[in-house]
């Protein structure tokens, strides 16, 4: 299914847009009501990349180039990806360690390349993550990524799972190579996925970071510290013009069986005003619809 921009912006989750938002202007004038759009496009910081409010992650319980999504099998997983796109999801988040590049490439092969965003991550740590022991430089890795993704460019490439507060010093070589790839338009932006408070602080202070994947929800579940410590650093990222991609909105599945916690987490993250897109590791298309409905409800409550 191909949608032009106008069609895309008009799309809302089925049944979730029945309540309309009223918009009052100066002097009490009423603008035409418009449905809340859980998939609305917005900027990823100052990268120039436009992202949908909801993105799909592909690495639930991921490692060794497989994940819950790949374990579904090709037909089911690619059907999930296509269904997400048809609903309005435009951010597809991957990583080398998830083994999901080829699945995403096949699912989106008939879609206009400028209508979706590919984000992926390279594993630089010794041990774990990916099967082989070698850790080639970023130019070699990204070239393989482009072949696997069947694309000339990748929108966002991240250094995966940064835990050390000294990662900007330790990863200087790969950072410089990624900077060169951006200058050559092989990638559009670079950044980090964060897995410690110290690494998050370093990302907020680093001019190199275009965008960061951060773990954020209302309860501190699977996060890098209590929300009262994490949220201010995320705000610094945002104010510095860096893209902010929210992860672990559902606590890596911890809130799956709690309507109250899922709703509270969505409301909390949207209320921060600092997260550009929310990436969730959906495993069923019904989960996409459910999350979109919760986002719609939260947006309407904010209006």
Q: Which residues are covered by each model-predicted region?
A:
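Short, acidic/polar
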Residues: 69-83, 134-148, 195-202, 261-268
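Acidic (Asp/Glu)-rich catalytic clusters
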Residues: 46-48, 105-113, 146-150, 204-207, ...
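Beta/alpha (TIM)-barrel catalytic core signal, keyed to glycine-rich beta->alpha loops juxtaposed to Asp/Glu
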Residues: 6, 161-303
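Alpha-helical scaffolding within the catalytic cores
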Residues: 36-42, 101-102, 140-145, 196-200, ...
């Amino acid at each position: 299914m191909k949608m032009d921009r106008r069609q895309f912006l008009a799309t809302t989750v089925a049944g979730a847009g029945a309540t309309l938002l009223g918009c009052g202007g100066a002097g009490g004038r009423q603008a035409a009501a418009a449905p809340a759009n859980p998939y609305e496009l917005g900027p990823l910081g100052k990268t120039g990349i436009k992202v949908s409010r909801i993105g799909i992650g592909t690495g639930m319980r991921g490692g060794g180039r497989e994940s819950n999504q790949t374990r579904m099998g090709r037909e089911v997983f690619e059907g999930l990806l296509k269904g997400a796109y048809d609903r309005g999801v435009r951010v597809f988040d991957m990583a080398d360690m998830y083994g999901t590049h080829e699945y995403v490439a096949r699912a989106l092969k008939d879609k206009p390349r400028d209508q979706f965003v590919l984000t992926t991550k390279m594993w630089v740590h010794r041990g774990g993550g990916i099967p082989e022991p070698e850790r080639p430089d970023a130019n070699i890795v990204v070239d393989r990524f482009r072949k696997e993704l069947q694309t000339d460019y990748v929108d966002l490439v991240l250094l995966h799972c940064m835990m050390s507060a000294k990662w900007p010093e330790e990863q200087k070589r790969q950072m410089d190579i990624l900077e060169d790839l951006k200058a050559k338009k092989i990638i559009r932006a670079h950044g980090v996925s964060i897995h410690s408070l110290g690494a998050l602080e370093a990302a907020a202070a680093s001019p190199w970071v275009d965008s960061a994947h951060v773990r954020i929800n209302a309860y501190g579940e699977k996060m890098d510290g209590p929300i009262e410590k994490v949220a201010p650093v995320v705000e610094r990222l945002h104010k510095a013009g860096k893209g902010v991609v929210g992860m672990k909105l559902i606590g890596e599945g911890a809130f799956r069986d709690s309507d109250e916690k899922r709703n509270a987490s969505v409301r909390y993250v949207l209320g921060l005003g600092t997260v550009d897109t929310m990436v969730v590791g959906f495993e069923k298309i019904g989960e996409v619809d459910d999350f979109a409905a919760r986002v719609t409800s939260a947006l309407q409550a904010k209006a």
